[in-house]
């Protein structure tokens, strides 16, 4: 896969970590960049700046040490508020502003934000025009294929986006009504790619190197947005890049390497969030890392009762040292891709 340009920035391998609320915090973004992501995007930040003083919102902002280019996703349904939020994030260090018109969550859509905006093409245009005019950095957009299967207007929205000055577009291959059920469809993404000249990134159900190649071939997309498949498997980016370059799959990770990555991730979470919140946040990540391993269910029940950072790290070490064998119960197990 060739490099993709977004304004002055180059995504060297066309692979982007999709923004995911509650997941793509700074520790996870840094880890995914280290393990092959060409660009990482922050968690969604509300455009309502009156809410930015909460600890939750502050932690979602750009921080020292964030890998460049620093991309921040904003969400909202008011053009002026979105423009103001974009400008404020640039002042805080954002180098790319990403607009969320793809989130299907009810709490977002009920506020006429996220993928709810796809119902109102004029409002889509107003928001995009306002944000692009407000900042001097590239503005990107994430959408779904439409509101529901009878209203797949992703192609129209993509044309609106290009005319408004959006510099790259990510398309999830489901409608808002689909949520995350069923399978993503890629025909609409292919149509969008043919209709616009800005870079298009395909998203949805890309969970293996082989699937990545299939989606690229099916859509003609310039790159890929990887989301849920990176949870507990941040090395998926280098797996995909290697496969696309060579046609060969990388060997599965040894358990010792998974242990190292997981402990590094836990330590970063504990530092970033502090002991109390860091312990809570770490629980879901550990569940994702170990989901396919024998004994993981019992271990998670124990791990989720731990209340301090040292105990969490010690128990992870013990889990791996007690002969964690992997899917085939082999010594020095390999983690299945």
Swiss-Prot record:
Cofactor or coenzyme needed: FMN
EC number: 1.3.1.-
UniProt GO molecular function: flavin adenine dinucleotide binding; FMN binding; tRNA binding; tRNA dihydrouridine synthase activity
Binding site for FMN: 19-21, 73, 142, 203-205, 227-228
Catalytic activity: a 5,6-dihydrouridine in tRNA + NAD(+) = a uridine in tRNA + NADH + H(+); a 5,6-dihydrouridine in tRNA + NADP(+) = a uridine in tRNA + NADPH + H(+)
UniProt KW keywords: Flavoprotein, FMN, NADP, Oxidoreductase, RNA-binding, tRNA processing, tRNA-binding
Active-site residue list: 103 (proton donor)
Cross-referenced CDD domains: DUS_like_FMN (cd02801)
Family annotation (Pfam families): Dus (PF01207)
Family: Belongs to the Dus family. DusB subfamily.
UniProt-listed HAMAP family: DusB_subfam
Function: Catalyzes the synthesis of 5,6-dihydrouridine (D), a modified base found in the D-loop of most tRNAs, via the reduction of the C5-C6 double bond in target uridines.
Protein's name according to its UniProt entry: tRNA-dihydrouridine synthase B
Organism field: Pseudomonas syringae pv. tomato (strain ATCC BAA-871 / DC3000)
Gene name per UniProt: dusB
